[in-house]
Amino acid sequence: MSNPACSNLFNNGCDHNSFNYSTSLSYIYNSHGSYYYSNTTNPNYINHTHTTSTSPNSPPLREALPLLSLSPIRHQEQQDQHYFMDTHQISSSNFLDDPLVTVDLHLGLPNYGVGESIRSNIAPDATTDEQDQDHDRGVEVTVESHLDDDDDHHGDLHRGHHYWIPTPSQILIGPTQFTCPLCFKTFNRYNNMQMHMWGHGSQYRKGPESLRGTQPTGMLRLPCFCCAPGCKNNIDHPRAKPLKDFRTLQTHYKRKHGSKPFACRMCGKAFAVKGDWRTHEKNCGKLWYCSCGSDFKHKRSLKDHVKAFGNGHVPCGIDSFGGDHEDYYDAASDIEQ
């Protein structure tokens, strides 16, 4: 029969070792080939460290180290990278789903070229009444404003001055067409139309006041550039200079760029301006002589010669090809009438 005291002691010890002995075992392998067993218990218990020495002939088994790709740091970086890629894709898809937005970028300095024009239906110098009348007649005028002060090759135009570049039809026909309300004949000048109206009856005669037209005088006084390319009076020419006014431009355009319907019946020379043709036929075939023996085809050339040499040089007379010269001139006068 056992001793009750010993039995109680044994049972208490077993219970203590069975239920209250909670351990946490960790294995640590050092470089000397020893395993350390660390038993972590409550503060009331004992930690046991057991050192096992292995013989050199039988090295201990070594566990394979985990791959670096499975390390927590690398795994976290991969997760962050995947999250960034997913976020970028979502933002890109949202941008594509949004309606397109157009942005105008104005890069560079503003270009204030000479070719920039201010299109208007009237001249800036015209009065209000003239502007209304020009608009009613449908006059289309291109008014250019010179903006570059540093350009020396554009004549005497400066900032704030205006000029006009008429079209070929405006040059040849005229900027304004006045129409007779009875026969619908057109005239370039208001005075000519009024005189034509007098022929329809005395009821259209209203005295001298009826001849005072309302032409766009402000527009006709503007300096004009020629519209023909390559002309020295074209605005794109390196040394372009504007012509004084519209009438001067008309004569220039007819002489330099227009057709020449008038031909001299003495020599066959063609002219674009009727006045030039009349003057030429009047003097064609004539020779002007100087007292020094020089002859000239033009009277103005003889005058320049006498003025240049002075004493001893005086006009002597005029010679012509034949007596039929006056007949040619008379015939030309009859045609003009």
Swiss-Prot record:
GO (cellular component) term, any one: nucleus
Main location: nucleus
UniProt record similarity statement: Belongs to the WIP C2H2-type zinc-finger protein family.
Pfam family, one: zf-C2H2_STOP2_3rd
InterPro entries for this protein: C2CH-3rd_BIRD-IDD, WIP1/2/3/4/5/6, Znf_C2H2_sf, Znf_C2H2_type
Motif position, Nuclear localization signal: 254-257, 297-300
The name this protein goes by in its record: Zinc finger protein WIP5
Keywords: Metal-binding, Nucleus, Repeat, Transcription, Transcription regulation, Zinc, Zinc-finger
